[in-house]
Structure formats: structure tokens, C-alpha cells
Amino acid sequence: MNADLTIAEVRLTPVLVSDPPLLNTQGVHQPYTARLIVEIVTAGGVTGLGETYGDGKYLELAAPMASALRGRPVSDLNGLFTLADTVQVDSARVEDSVDVGGLRGVQTADKLRLSVVSAFEVACLDALGKVQGLPVHALLGHKVRDRVEYSAYLFYRWAEHPGGAGEGDDWDEATDPAGIVAQARRFAGDYGFRSFKLKGGVYEPDREIAAVRALAEAFPGAPLRLDPNGAWSVPTSLRVAEELGEVLEYLEDPTSGTPGMAHVAREAGVPLATNMCVTTFPEIPEAFTTGAVQIVLSDHHYWGGLRRTRELAAVCRTFGVGVSMHSNTHLGISLAAMTHVAATVPNLEHACDSHYPWQGEDVLTRRLAFHEGCVEVSDAPGLGVELDSERLAALHERWLEDDGTMRDRDDAAAMRKADPGWTTPAVPRW
């Protein structure tokens, strides 16, 4: 193998992948969601893979960064951030509101840049690992565990998209406690998951409380989480915490904003987790000093990559704050990257989130598998995954044929297919 680490080519391929009608507080997932697949090719002929959000605002940043990467070594990981700082972000693309593309806190220009940098960093690490014959986790200091545990990600959902749009799947409707328990039983049976997270903020709190209680009865002692994406007021959050405190592992983002979370944390008897009020390093001081969160759900996509995820974990360890991982709709490249970095974090004490079982399509030659709710950490060079070029081309063709409706995530617009009068709800909803 030619060991020349110089970047000779960068390929950016946006794709549209099928997505089920999963409900959240802002609406429902569209029939397809956009992802960006990054291929970095070295002068030595080695290709590294990365993946991130595929909405237009990310593609606009990825293109100039890709051009500037040519001629640099894949080992220059620090240079990625210097390069990103030179890329201008269209102010019209930055909204001072919660980012609907995964409900991951307020959107900022830096977060947009980091969400693109992360894909390039993962691709560089994948290529570097292949050249050196080392798995990505070894480039990060080596694994401290042989497998990474994930949690079943439960959603209220419809049986199909309005009008039968999209590719469809074989999952049933789940809009009540019985439906959620049935969904959880299938996740446990098919993948061996031993902990369960319910995406809330969809129905009135009492209905979601009933669903969590039904899960506790069906799976005695299993770790349970409830995430309403900041849809509740402080009083409602406190009431839910009081009613479910004995069965919840943690309550995730019950209310919006660090001050509200701090209020709930002071009075509730249940730990609070977040992927909304701590999403950048500058947000840490207020959240940690006020005791607003007890667990940070990291996400290498918008934190800026795998090395920054490890930096975040170290800060959390310093302050005695727990750490786990958030998930958005993603494919196997992202899951492989998540698994490698999670394997290197000593203080990872909670099962990570993953949408992956909901995605029936992928760009890999072989899907990653869950056994007993865990993904084995690959010791193969790089990420240990292989790109299926034909499948990538087919999903890219779908993106090309789309009229633009699906290229940017908009859960409220998708909900209007079922409810024409729907608008993004103001928070708190309850």
C-alpha cells in the first residue's frame, strides 16, 4: 500500500434515505432524509469515509472546504478547524431557534461548520487508520471496551406516511402505551436491547407517563428514559419527574433552556440529561455551575468530530457529569464512528442512542449488527466498514430526482400532509 497521506481527491455525495413516520414535538419525520457521504482519497489510493447531515446549508459549507483540503495530509486533523474558520456561513442559514434537524439546541454558524468538519475528520481518521493498519479507536488512544451498548429508541409513530408516501416498512402504528410496549418488545427481540428511550413531547404528558409506566411493567428494572425535547414547562417537568422518578434512568431535556433545566434539577429527584442546552463548549460553564444537567448526550457530528467528543467527555469527568451519546437519523458510517469513539471513553456509563434500526437503507456493503443491544468494536483498519458504490449511486440518484421537497428536513411541513393547519408548536406546549 502506498503510504502517501496527501489528499488527492474529495468526493461529496448527498443522498436521500427512507425514514419512517416517527413523531416528535415539532411534527413528523419526512419520508426521506438527506445525508452527506464524504470520501477522502489519498495520493496513495486509500479512501476514507465520513458522514453528516445532508441539508443544503451543510452542502454549501462542505464544497469549499473539500476544495481546500486537496494537497493537505489526512494526518493534519487540527488544520481542519483552522480551515473551517475561513469558510463563510450565510447568515440567512442561521436561525436563532431550535434546529429541527435533530432538535439539537439553538443553531449557530460555528455548529454548522463543526457539523461539516466532523465528517471530514472521520474520513481522515478512516484513511489514516487504513494506511497505518490501525482501527480508528487505536488512533484515539485505543478502546477501553470491546463492545458499545445502545438503547432502543422508541417513537410514537404512524403505520405509514400520509398518502402512503416513501418506501414503507413492516412496523405497526404506535400511538398509545400498548403500541409503545409492542415496539419495545420487538426491539428487544430483534436486537437484544436492554434499555429503552421514548421520544416524548408528542402527546399530553399524562399519556406519555402512562407509556413509561407500561414499559416499566413490561421490562422490570430496565433503564428507561423519556425525552420531550423541551416541550414542557418547569411545573409540568417537575410533576412528570415526581410521577416517574422511581422508574426513570434519567429525564432528557424536559424543559427548554439552561435556567429552566437548572430549576427542574434543583427540585426533581431524577437526573437530567441534555443534547439541547449543552451542544457547544461555551454552553458548558453555565450548565455545569448551575447543576442544570447530570448527563451530557454528546454527538460527534455537531461537536466537531471524534477527538472533540473525547475532549467533551474529559470535561464532563472533571465536573462529575455523566456522558452518553445522542442520535439523529444516520447510516452505518456514522454508527461505526460513534462506536469507535464510544469505545475509547472511560466514563461512558449509559447506553448510547441510535436511530440505526429504523433505517432500512444503508450505503455499506454489510450493515452493522446489534447483539444483546451492543455493537462490537471493530479492530479492522480504519472504521472497519466498506462503501457499497452501487447503493450510494442509487440513493444519490434519488436525491437528484427530488424536487427539493425532501432535501432539507422540515418535520412541520411533513406533519401538514396529515394536518394542513399544523404549525411548529411554541414551547412550552404543556
Task: Write out the residue ranges for each language-model feature.
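Conserved, mostly hydrophobic/aromatic
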Residues: 7, 45, 120, 133, ...
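Metal- or metallocofactor-binding catalytic centers and their adjacent structured scaffolds
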Residues: 9, 41-131, 420-430
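A cross-domain feature marking catalytic cores of carbohydrate-active enzymes
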Residues: 52, 106, 110, 152-154, ...
